[in-house]
């Protein structure tokens, strides 16, 4: 509740609500040069208000990412999703975080673990949760230079190999385990978009792969976020759906109408 007379009074059930009330006052003054008297009750219609930035294909210094994140807070968005690995122009392979895997980290710009951890914690003070995505088993060209034997082709991991499953697990272990994990948020994006559905055998392996990593991150107390892909990869292998967040970006990959029970 925002009440303005000869003084500004903001009441809210949480610190986040108080922060948004303050933002409303600042927005009003910035727009009109004054703050009108009266009462206003405001609340978020959607619990998740998010946007994604692809920092893989185009390196953005962390200082600027932080500035953008503060703008998210100003417009009352409460999550920012960072896509950190992909394939760049001219075959340049990109992984934007410092990694224990030798040769994996991008050479044209990356974020150290310490500075990335600090950035995420600082943004929580602005009410914005940073969700980091490691995209596998497609969009995986960045791994070709370090584990070429695990690649199906230039951009896809070979998920038929047990060694691939162990390699991807080691990546998540590196970033979500420990007393002070690199990924601060309880939510972890595991990717899973745009893999082949040309053969039923591949589809079933992809579904098993997706289910495996959902359960893996949950085992560390995290909530899995995935790209919608299971309409594209329709099959028999069950994939856990309870308490999962799905980013449905294209109906050809995940059609909401066919997924409603």
Could you say what each language-model-derived stretch is?
Residues 148-245, 249-260:
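Active-site neighborhood of glycoside hydrolase catalytic domains
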Residues 2-189, 212, 216:
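Feature activates predominantly on carbohydrate-active enzymes
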